[in-house]
Amino acid sequence: IANNLYIQEVGTGKETQITNDGKQNQVINGSADWVYEEEFSMAKAFWWAPDSKKIAFLRFDESNVKEFTMTNYTGELYPDYETFKYPKVGANNALVTAHIYNTDSRKTVVADAGADKDIYYPRLTWTTDPNKVVITKLNRHQNHLELLSTDAATGNTTVLLEEKNKYYIDIDDNLTFLEDGKSFIWTSEM
């Protein structure tokens, strides 16, 4: 079960496994890695579509991230040690991809976010249209942001909005889609 994503039907208890490649300190599906928890205040990395027929999730490939051992002083005579993937400045981050699983077809598509793989997806937001999810894409320097409208059936993306700053772009949760599923309100410091 660790590092994989499952769906459980409340009424029947039936469980469906969405991913099967999760492995400790290798691949995480649907849960954030250390960087996303610290930098973007993200713990869970999955989001249901408004019609509950699709689930978008992030996949973190940590296989090229170096490990770090932390001492955990528990009050006992000897401390515990925890080793986990911990990228330091300039070192490899996890390779992150956005996926969309369809509960009817049981198929998963990968969002096409372009050629640059050294990026962040600090936010995913479904529009009111259950076939469109918007991915916030941010470069490694965190000074170039794109909102990508993503087709849930194909993974094809279109840039809705782009912001660049010489220094830094702060991430927030101020993206609201209106009832038509196309119009949105976005707050910005630019």
Spans of features found by a protein language model:
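Beta-strand C-termini and the immediately following turn/loop, strongest in propeller blades
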Residues: 1-4, 9, 44-47, 56-62, ...
